[in-house]
Structure formats: C-alpha cells, structure tokens
C-alpha cells in the first residue's frame, strides 16, 4: 500500500496519481485490481448510489457503512473517506471525533475536507491529531447551493487569485494532497506548479499531478448524464441490461434453470420420497 510520502515522491518524479471513487466492496475490489493508487469513498455516493439530488443528505453513518465495505474490497489500497456535510463545521471537537470515527471504523488512511477559509483550523486540528487530510477546492458540492450552483470555479482573475491563496493555506495547514474540481486548466496548472503537495484533478485539465473519476462514470453504470469532464471507458449499462433481459426471457420461456443449474436426487432416495411408488 502506498503512503502519503509515496504520493509526494510521485509528484516530484512526474508520475501521475490514479484515484478512483468507489463506494462498496465490488467497485473498490475492481479499482484495486485495476491498479488505482488511491480509492476515494466520496459523499457523492448520495447522488450515485443512494439516489439523492445532493450530497448534503449523506450522514456519517452512510460514510462509515460504505467506507467499511470499500476497505474490505481493497485492503491493499490507500483509501480516503469524505467528511460529510456538517461533520467538520460546528467545532474542532466535533471535527476530531468525526474524523477519528471515519479512520477507526472504516480503516481508511485519510479523510477529505471540502473548502478553505473557516475550514483551515479544522484541517490543522485533524493533522495535529494524526489524521491525514486531503483538501478539496474549486467546485465543492456540499456548498454548491450557496455558491451559485454546479459550475466552473475560478474563471475570473479575482476568483483565481483567491483560490491560489486558499490552496496555499490548505498546504500550510498540513493537507498532504489537494483535489481540484471544475476549475480552468490554466489555473490548475499554476496551482500544481506552486504547491509542494500533489494535486488531483476532476475537470481541471491534464496538468494536475493526478486524476480522479467516479467508478460509475468511468463504466457508464447507472448514470443518467455525465458531466463534461467525464470520459467513459465502457458501457456497463448496456451489457448489464442485456444480461437482465436475457435472464427474464429465459425464466418466462422455462429455459432457466436447465439441468446444468439444477440439483438431482439418487434413484433410491426418490423411491423413499415417493413411498416406493415407481
């Protein structure tokens, strides 16, 4: 399993970091088999697998439940678990308790915290307590509703300068890596050049130190409409739907189960069953 130090080495050597967002045992298992460097158990599970229209409905219990499953599927991969909405906003004490729960109860190696500004003391406290932190800036889904919705961040000069300040504060607070979501590729490149910690982009261009996409988006699995920054590498929906339809057809036509998928009794046992009748 890689460590935080390994990710810094990868940045310095120009080796790209592969992060895959996965929410359960089978998806995390496949991500590990594919050679992912990091698996993110994101609160986007609210949208992707729980059917919510926002991540704000995801609870600590949800994150722990899915984090434990993902860890069982990928025991040898570095796992990052999201701090869900309001789990690190009320007090430093609450932040530490929730961060500790995520690490202890899921087996994750780190937590991810959205935002800067008022979140800086919380990031610093987590790191001082021995909990590795990934910061998340740009489009931050937990606060999208109050920041103008789901759109690209940092497109004007003032917003870009503010983000440059924010990422440096996150680094100084002790974050060991940074997720950059939906920002101009030029800004992402500038940030990546100016930071010593690795950057992982999602909708942030090719010049970040790594990339992250959601398992379901990569495979076109259960997603209705993918964002612009998503590239699908397979169409699992078509394959799975065909399999389910074939199953239903064979049940109705009595072609399933056939002898290959059925069990039998010995002839003498059948006689016992039938009371000696032939």
UniProtKB/Swiss-Prot annotation:
It is found in: Cytoplasm. Mg(2+) binds at residues 43, 82, 114. Disulfide bonds: none annotated. It catalyses: 3-methyl-2-oxobutanoate + (6R)-5,10-methylene-5,6,7,8-tetrahydrofolate + H2O = 2-dehydropantoate + (6S)-5,6,7,8-tetrahydrofolate. CDD domains: KPHMT-like. The active site is at residue 181. Keywords: Cytoplasm, Magnesium, Metal-binding, Pantothenate biosynthesis, Transferase. GO terms for cellular component: cytoplasm. InterPro entries: Pantoate_hydroxy_MeTrfase, Pyrv/PenolPyrv_kinase-like_dom, Pyrv_kinase-like_dom_sf. Its EC number is 2.1.2.11. GO terms for molecular function: 3-methyl-2-oxobutanoate hydroxymethyltransferase activity; magnesium ion binding. Catalyzes the reversible reaction in which hydroxymethyl group from 5,10-methylenetetrahydrofolate is transferred onto alpha-ketoisovalerate to form ketopantoate. Belongs to the PanB family. This is 3-methyl-2-oxobutanoate hydroxymethyltransferase. The lineage of its organism: Bacteria, Bacillati, Bacillota, Clostridia, Eubacteriales. The gene is panB.
